[in-house]
């Protein structure tokens, strides 16, 4: 007897009347006149499959006691369903109960609406819900599409280090990695912590970005990307921030900001097309329960050409909008989410690429423009969320890079390896970063980024 996934059983590609076996968990059960109708899910798709068990089965009394969350193996004949809302069902010839729910009344995942706040408290069980099953499958679809896009376009995937000595953003919000005894810290003659006695012989941190490391491979392999975990010790209790998240960071050699922006547009549209093509069932659920525009916003995003405007122009548009914003709009200040959303939703009505930001509000590695006041940086803004991608052309001129590092108070000797790229065959190059969880939030219409990752890490929260 063939073991199949629920998705495969419901797809209509198996012979009707054939014998199959499915393995999964009970979503719901109802009984009627010697019959038990068991909705079984294995996580392979949004819909469950109905298993119909009758009272001729030797363990029918056991079957009737099944509750949500119990695990089972059902064998039987695959037939077209007579009921509404399902294409096929299984007429069971046997139901083996693998695992019971210890106390159904206290089982946290009940077949009823539950708030995201409650589900964060039981994050180890929340993938069993409709919502987080859908989010997880979409997250997986996006991750697979990321690698597929870059592979098809000739990029090499680079594994950048998680433990590092460099602050790629220059912001200093890094988690320290140490094996020193926190109670009896070794001190040097000046009374400072002696990190020479630490595991690596120096002060080390969790990475905030793989960009600096991946640039090394860009300047040898031309087109590369990294996709991995990053960490920010930013004490932000917001719906938009995580302490641990995943970043996608491509880097392209012999490229300027315009080419970087084109890559970002192609990339996002490819990802959204993949989700529409592969996860329609999950998107339909999200459109019904979470974000009514879950499908239409992705279709609109794919079909709309990106608008590109200069930061200075964006500031003028905002100042002349007549709208009262919570945050001030002035040249030299970074754009806030409310400003970004006004540009994309109320003024332009489609994705926007804002370019050429003031040099003092962007990172040291971004290429200084000829005006000396702005850098070749870009933010891709999406309706409904604001910034979704941040990128730039990198500073390839050693003297200018050194001046920028001095401006930011960075020790150029500490970054000597990064400076080497400008000393040995330097070329113009560019790249961007996309926070993967922010992408999941946008696609799924979630209101809190802590629901876009299996086990959220945030200030004061590191459970499981």
Swiss-Prot record:
CDD domains: AsxRS_core (cd00776), EcAsnRS_like_N (cd04318)
EC nos: 6.1.1.22
EC category name: ligase
Disulfide links within the chain: none
Enzymatic reactions: tRNA(Asn) + L-asparagine + ATP = L-asparaginyl-tRNA(Asn) + AMP + diphosphate + H(+)
GO biological process: asparaginyl-tRNA aminoacylation
UniProt subcellular location: Cytoplasm
GO MF, one example: nucleic acid binding
Pfam families: tRNA-synt_2, tRNA_anti-codon
One GO CC annotation: cytoplasm
InterPro entries: Aa-tRNA-synt_II, aa-tRNA-synth_II, aa-tRNA-synth_II/BPL/LPL, Asn-tRNA-ligase, Asp/Asn-tRNA-synth_IIb, NA-bd_OB-fold, NA-bd_OB_tRNA
Annotated keywords: Aminoacyl-tRNA synthetase, ATP-binding, Cytoplasm, Ligase, Nucleotide-binding, Protein biosynthesis
Signal peptide: none
Similarity comment text for this entry: Belongs to the class-II aminoacyl-tRNA synthetase family.
Subunit structure: Homodimer.
Entry protein name: Asparagine--tRNA ligase
Species for this entry: Xanthomonas euvesicatoria pv. vesicatoria (strain 85-10)
Lineage: Bacteria, Pseudomonadati, Pseudomonadota, Gammaproteobacteria, Lysobacterales
Gene name for this UniProt entry: asnS
């Amino acid at each position: 007897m063939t073991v199949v996934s629920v998705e495969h059983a419901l797809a209509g590609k198996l012979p009707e009347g054939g014998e199959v076996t499915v393995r999964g968990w009970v979503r719901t059960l109802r009984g009627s006149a010697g019959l038990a109708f068991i909705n079984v899910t294995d996580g392979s798709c949004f819909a469950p499959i109905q298993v119909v068990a009758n009272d001729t089965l030797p363990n029918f009394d056991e079957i009737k006691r099944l509750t949500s969350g119990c695990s089972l193996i059902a064998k039987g004949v695959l037939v077209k369903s007579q009921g509404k809302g399902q294409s096929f069902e299984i007429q069971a010839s046997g139901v083996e109960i693998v695992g019971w729910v210890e106390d159904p009344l206290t089982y946290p995942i009940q077949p009823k609406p539950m708030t995201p706040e409650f589900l964060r408290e039981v994050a180890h069980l929340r993938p069993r819900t409709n919502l987080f099953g859908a989010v997880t499958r979409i997250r997986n679809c996006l991750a697979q599409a990321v690698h597929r896009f870059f592979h098809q376009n000739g990029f090499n995937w680079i594994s950048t280090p998680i433990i590092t000595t460099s602050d790629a953003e220059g912001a200093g919000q890094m988690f320290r990695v140490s094996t020193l005894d926190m109670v009896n810290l070794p001190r040097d003659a000046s009374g400072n912590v002696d990190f020479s006695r630490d595991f690596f012989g120096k002060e080390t941190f969790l990475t905030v970005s793989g960009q600096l490391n991946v640039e090394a491979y860009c300047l040898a392999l031309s087109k590369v990307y990294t996709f991995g975990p990053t960490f920010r010790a930013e004490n932000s209790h917001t719906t938009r921030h995580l302490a641990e998240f995943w970043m996608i960071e491509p880097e392209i050699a012999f490229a300027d900001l315009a080419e970087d922006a084109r890559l970002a547009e192609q990339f996002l549209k490819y990802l959204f097309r993949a989700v529409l093509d592969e996860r329609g069932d999950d998107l339909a659920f999200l459109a019904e329960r979470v974000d009514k525009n879950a499908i239409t916003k992705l279709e609109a995003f794919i079909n709309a050409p990106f608008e590109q405007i200069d930061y200075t122009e964006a500031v003028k548009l905002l100042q002349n909008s007549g709208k009262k914003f919570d945050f001030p709009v002035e040249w030299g200040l970074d754009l806030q989410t409310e400003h970004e959303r006004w540009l994309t939703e109320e003024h332009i009505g489609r994705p926007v690429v804002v370019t050429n930001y003031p040099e003092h509000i962007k990172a040291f590695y971004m290429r200084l423009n000829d005006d000396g006041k702005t850098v070749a940086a870009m933010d891709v803004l999406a309706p409904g969320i604001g910034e979704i991608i941040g990128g730039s052309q990198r500073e390839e001129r050693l003297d200018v890079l050194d001046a920028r590092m001095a401006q930011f108070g960075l020790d150029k000797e500490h970054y000597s390896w990064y400076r080497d790229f400008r000393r040995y065959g330097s070329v113009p190059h560019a790249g961007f970063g996309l926070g993967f969880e922010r992408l999941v939030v946008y696609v799924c219409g979630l209101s809190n980024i802590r629901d876009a990752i299996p086990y959220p890490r945030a200030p004061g929260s590191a459970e499981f």
